[in-house]
Amino acid sequence: MGRKDHTNKTREVAAQLAADGWIEARRGPGDHVQYKHPIKKGRVTLDRGAKEIPTGTLRSIYRQADWKW
């Protein structure tokens, strides 16, 4: 089975969210930022203080953003 390479860099994921139409809705405690989409339901929370995102957290972000893993 082939491995899909998903970027786990915080800046790149933030750029992907912005490119998909997600807008910064609010800043949470510490370096956490919540993104909101004008059409899609829910919010995506991203820790902007970390350089890399753990795989499980990244997968959760993909689910919240309604992206295919």
Residue ranges and their predicted role:
Residues M1-D31, K36-W69:
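Basic nucleic-acid-binding interfaces
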